[in-house]
Amino acid sequence: MSSGAPSGSSMSSTPGSPPPRAGGPNSVSFKDLCCLFCCPPFPSSIVSKLAFMPPEPSYTITEDNKLVLIEGRAAWPHQEVDMANCVEMRITRTRRRNRVACTMIRPLPNSHFTLLFSHGNAVDLGQMTSFLYGLGFHLNCNVFSYDYSGYGCSTGKPSEKNLYADITAAFELLKSEFGVPKEKIILYGQSIGTVPSVDLASREDLAALVLHSPLMSGMRVAFPGTTTTWCCDAFPSIEKVPRVKCPTLVIHGTDDEVIDFSHGVSIYERCPTSVEPLWVPGAGHNDVELHAAYLERLRSFIDMEASAIRVTAPITNATSTNSRTISNGTSS
């Protein structure tokens, strides 16, 4: 293996979403669900109790913006690579006055795109750094990521409102501090990370969007078969994705035990700029990236489809993949 390559010939599983408690959201007790969704006027704060599971911080940040992993909580297996040479840390502040920890990972020189990665609900940046380095190496992309409020070295408490403020602050830092223009930023959201990714993509014109195991909304995860977005619903990505204007790749395992496969299909169908999706037969919520098709599809998406599709007019009823208009006047 050439110098600087991540250890191993394939991607290791992300620690992004460890097995959920009691079998995941679909097996939460009726009492828990009543407490979760039927206690206005603060449904979003109640949702947070089940949606967010921040671990004990796995890292610290030095005064000169270096990442220090805490032994026993996170590891850097790439022995041939000096982490200090390719990983930079920053702290930014959100509009809700929380401090958010961010990392810029540069596995290779002269990468064209930067992934803005939003991780799962039970990890922090320290635990994700090794995976993000490997992902960037295999895709020839820089990777910029951040911790949600209440995770890692970020202050505050995790909540839906903070999710949106966190990604906005990270996005602004990526542009201002690192000089990355919008047209070279690819959003990548995994699991709960698809929620802020869809929100930002619905407001900004970016290079592309990757949605890995997305959810339609909180109510639809907790109550399978729900077809209406209620006023108390949290994380309503299904209502925002029709406003996305950049090429969008949806990835989902057909046997996902946490966020049902139907969520990925519905997000794909509602997005006016979705490209050929990656449905991984037999994959669950935590092992999609172990399949060879994962990296293959991401490479082709980034090399051939990122920045290629643009919606020319707002989509008012994007319910079918046959109702998409793209900039060259063709349909897909």
UniProtKB/Swiss-Prot annotation:
Stretches the record annotates as Disordered: 1-24
Keyword field contains Hydrolase: yes
Alphabetical GO biological process terms: associative learning; behavioral response to starvation
Gene3D superfamilies in alphabetical order: alpha/beta hydrolase
Low complexity composition bias: residue spans: 1-15
Cysteine disulfide links: none
Keyword Ribosomal protein: no
A Pfam family: Hydrolase_4
Name the record gives this protein: Alpha/beta hydrolase domain-containing protein aho-3
Organism annotation: Caenorhabditis elegans
Record gene name: aho-3
